[in-house]
Structures are given as C-alpha cells and as structure tokens.
C-alpha cells in the first residue's frame, strides 16, 4: 500500500510518500508528481521518503526521473538513503 500526501511549505511543496513504492503504486506517485508540477510550475518539490519502507526497480526509476527533473529526495532510513545514493550517483551528483 502507498499513501501520498502534499504539504505546502510556502516556497516549496512536500510530497510525502508512505508505504511501499512498488508495482501498481508507482504510476500513482507518478500521476501525483506530474499533476503537482503542472499545477505549480516553478515551485520547488521535495519528496519525503522518511516513511517509505520499500522501493522496487520501477519505483527507483521513477525517483530517478523525478530527481533529474530537479526534485529533492529526502530520507532518514539507511535503506532509503542507499536508494537515493544510487540515484544521485547515476546522475553524477553527491548524496545529500
């Protein structure tokens, strides 16, 4: 199961992703992301993966697309930090 919520932080929008980003849930996150960037062009977007438990290959690919478009990826768990490190390394950047 996946839960996606949006929080307006003033100058940024936070997309909080909770649960498992896998299988049929990946297109759900993609739709939420694309809707946000269409409705709020020019606003910085932060994807909060603090409560994300698992990401499959399709989810990793989507997060990579999001990162390359300028989205900031945030996480606390070692697992998710490793996922982000792989994504940023592939993009030629440092993990934050």
Where in this protein do the model-derived segments appear?
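STAS-like cytosolic regulatory interaction modules
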Residues: 1-96
């Amino acid at each position: 199961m996946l839960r996606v919520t949006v929080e307006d932080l003033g100058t940024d929008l936070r997309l909080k992703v909770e649960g498992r980003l896998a299988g049929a849930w990946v297109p759900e996150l993609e739709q939420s992301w694309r809707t946000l960037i269409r409705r709020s062009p020019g606003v910085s977007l932060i994807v909060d993966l603090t409560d994300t438990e698992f990401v499959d290959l399709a989810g990793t690919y989507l997060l990579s697309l999001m990162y390359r478009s300028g989205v900031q990826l945030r996480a606390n768990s070692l697992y998710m930090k490793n996922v982000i490190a792989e994504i940023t390394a592939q993009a030629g950047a440092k993990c934050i």
